[in-house]
Regions:
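Short coil/turn segments at secondary-structure boundaries
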Residues: 37, 158-159
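Non-DNA-binding regulatory cores of transcription-related proteins
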Residues: 90-156, 162
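Sparse recognition of residues in long alpha-helices and their boundaries
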Residues: 86, 93, 167-168
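Short, Lys/Arg- and Gly-enriched loop/turn segments at beta-strand edges
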Residues: 160-168
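N-terminal intrinsically disordered, low-complexity, charge/repeat-rich segments that act as generic
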Residues: 2-90
């Protein structure tokens, strides 16, 4: 992990924040596109198959269930995209709250939506190709532990102590 003084020494905080959010947004847009493609494919397969041959014929029903599953994934991805687009408008934070990007001495978090792990190009002279971030929702226990903290504050979560080094 880079030291606090090294982190963000190349870009200002606002630009870095935008870069991180855009990386997460690109990931979610890809998830949405894939879900839409799969949903359309399942619908097309169901249409091509035609009506059920008899009441025990479950292929069409299976395709419709798949379509519905992908439709739900698409809806969730689109909801996350809307949240991320809204967060692009926020300035960097001084305290950990929804929308903040938090760098601890152990991990990096984006407190936004439950998206999971994503990568961002590393902004340092150190030869590390990408930083790993975790986009987490407000319902997660780690979010609750971080909420309200400031730079220099520590939390203990699952037996691991982490110190907040930077908040964007």
């Amino acid at each position: 992990m880079p030291e606090n003084s090294d982190f963000l020494s190349i870009m200002d905080r606002t630009q870095r924040r935008i870069q991180i959010i855009q990386a997460c947004l690109a990931l979610q847009q890809q998830v949405a596109a894939t879900a839409k493609q799969e949903m359309d494919s399942a619908q097309q397969q169901s249409n091509d198959y035609g009506a059920n041959v008899d009441r025990y014929d479950s292929y069409r029903t299976k395709m419709m269930r798949q379509r519905d599953m992908y439709a739900k994934q698409l809806s969730n991805a689109n909801a996350s995209i809307r949240v991320l687009q809204e967060l692009l408008r926020h300035a960097p934070f001084d305290v950990v709250e929804h929308g903040a990007i938090v760098v601890t001495d152990k991990q990096r978090f984006f407190l936004s939506a439950g998206i999971g792990k994503f990568m961002v190009p590393y902004q340092s002279p150190v030869d590390v190709p990408q930083e790993v971030f975790f986009a987490i929702s407000a319902q997660t226990p780690i979010y609750m532990a971080l909420k309200g903290k400031r730079v220099g504050d520590s939390i203990t979560f699952n037996g691991m102590t982490q110190t907040v080094q930077e908040i964007l």
